[in-house]
């Protein structure tokens, strides 16, 4: 028998699995689920191993298979993205960003980026990694009418402030940023352009969003677990020269990481192949579903932002819920009905700590096979909550609704033979 405290922890895990995997409508824009095969191969001996260094030059022995996995994954990403260099060792998108900043921006240098209220990620701002690296930040100007970077004002800012690095991409990201236009002015001041593709990485790989490396960015960073539905991890892809790529490598290790969470490599590779096979359909459906959900919410009297632009061209929908009590209140109320979203600041908010909005992402529910009709049903659930209907009644309806959407699509299945091979290799069968 297991100790009771262990049984208690196992029970928590099982209850969480059941709740989030089977009973909730998961609309967090930064999350997703792996395919059955990717989730299975995520369980491997590499979870407890180290491989400091780079392929072919390690500080540890016993890494022959690590080198095969890391080399294969890096080369495959490079081929898919059209990159000269890829580093898959960062353990998150934020670590990938920090390594890029450290390699490309001198101490005391300047970074131009979007503030949080305009969608910028914490790692793009002095509240996050920029402060730790003693870098200065200047805010890219925002065009509220077009819900995007103000190109003309940004051009003037870049020419005046002459930043070392310009960060595009965002945490709240509804429309592609003007990479080409910013890259052109960056060239005149010698600035690097980094596109943080964390949120839209799967859309890029699936061809539903512009590839920033082909639009003029010098490098892109990403996480591998949002619209790209793999395990949590990070990646850096560049079109830079060998010297700069080597600086990035040295920033990843030994500066910011020692262990690269090697057990994710195989699952990430499986996911990348899945995106080659299913990604175009999956990415297209994600964008279609986001637009359908936005239109349905508007019809229900819960209007998303950016109506003039068609609401969204990504997986995200942003809704101003100030008239319903604000982002904090609405996100908590929706969770009571088993609808999971996050509060989010909007450009007109005076404080990001008291946001007027919520952010919604459809990538996970799309992977469970939902389409436009289901998006309209989700909009009705959300509207019912905001109109004050008993959340317990809505919760029961949500749980019943999810029963029809439990199978993960756009990925590889598993067989008993594969399960046996993995478990026997780990000696998990007794």
Curated annotation (Swiss-Prot):
PANTHER family: SERINE HYDROXYMETHYLTRANSFERASE (PTHR11680), SERINE HYDROXYMETHYLTRANSFERASE 1 (PTHR11680:SF35). Signal peptide: none annotated. This is Serine hydroxymethyltransferase. (6S)-5,6,7,8-tetrahydrofolate binds at residues 120-122. Its EC number is 2.1.2.-. It is an enzyme of class 2 (transferase). GO terms for molecular function: glycine hydroxymethyltransferase activity; pyridoxal phosphate binding. Catalyzes the reversible interconversion of serine and glycine with a modified folate serving as the one-carbon carrier. Also exhibits a pteridine-independent aldolase activity toward beta-hydroxyamino acids, producing glycine and aldehydes, via a retro-aldol mechanism. It holds the Pfam family SHMT. CDD domains: SHMT. Keywords: Amino-acid biosynthesis, Cytoplasm, One-carbon metabolism, Pyridoxal phosphate, Transferase. It comes from Pyrobaculum islandicum (strain DSM 4184 / JCM 9189 / GEO3). PROSITE patterns: SHMT.
């Amino acid at each position: 028998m297991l100790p009771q405290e262990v049984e208690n922890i196992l029970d928590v895990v099982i209850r969480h699995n059941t709740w989030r995997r089977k009973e909730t409508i998961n609309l967090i824009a930064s999350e997703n689920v792996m395919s059955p095969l990717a989730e299975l191969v995520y369980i491997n001996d590499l979870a407890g191993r180290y491989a400091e260094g780079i392929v072919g030059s390690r500080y540890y022995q016993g890494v022959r298979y690590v080198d095969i996995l890391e080399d294969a994954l890096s080369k495959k990403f490079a081929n898919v993205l059209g990159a000269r260099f890829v580093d898959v060792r960062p353990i998150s998108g934020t670590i990938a960003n920090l390594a890029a900043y450290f390699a490309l921006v001198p101490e005391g240098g300047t970074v131009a980026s979007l503030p949080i209220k305009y969608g910028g990620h914490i790692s793009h701002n002095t509240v996050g990694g920029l402060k730790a690296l003693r870098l200065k930040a200047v805010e890219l100007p925002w065009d509220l009418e077009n819900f995007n970077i103000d190109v003309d004002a940004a051009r003037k800012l870049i020419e005046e402030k002459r930043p070392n690095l310009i960060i595009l991409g965002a945490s709240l990201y509804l429309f592609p940023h003007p990479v080409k236009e910013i890259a052109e002015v960056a060239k005149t001041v010698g600035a690097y352009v980094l596109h943080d593709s964390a949120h839209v990485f799967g859309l890029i790989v699936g061809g539903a969003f512009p590839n920033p490396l082909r639009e003029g960015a010098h490098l892109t960073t990403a996480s591998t677990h949002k619209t790209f539905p793999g395990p949590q991890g990070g990646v850096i892809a560049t079109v830079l020269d060998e010297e700069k790529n080597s600086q990035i490598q040295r920033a990843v290790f030994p500066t910011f990481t020692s262990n690269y969470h090697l057990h994710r490599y195989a699952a990430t590779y499986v996911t990348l192949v899945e995106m080659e096979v299913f990604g175009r359909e999956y990415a297209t459906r994600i964008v279609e579903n986001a637009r359908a959900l936005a239109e349905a919410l508007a019809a229900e009297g819960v209007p998303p932002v950016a109506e003039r632009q068609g609401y969204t061209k990504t997986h995200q929908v942003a809704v101003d819920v100030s008239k319903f009590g604000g982002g904090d209140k609405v996100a908590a109320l929706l969770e009571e009905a088993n609808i999971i979203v996050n509060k989010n600041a909007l450009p007109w908010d005076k404080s990001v700590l008291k946001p007027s909005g919520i952010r919604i992402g459809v990538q996970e529910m799309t992977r469970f096979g939902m389409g436009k009709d289901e998006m309209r049903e989700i909009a009705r659930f959300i509207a019912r909550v905001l109109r004050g209907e008993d959340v317990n009644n809505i919760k029961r309806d949500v749980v019943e609704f999810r029963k029809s959407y439990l199978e993960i699509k756009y990925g590889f299945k598993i067989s008993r033979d594969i399960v046996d091979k993995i478990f026997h290799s780990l000696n998990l069968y007794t």
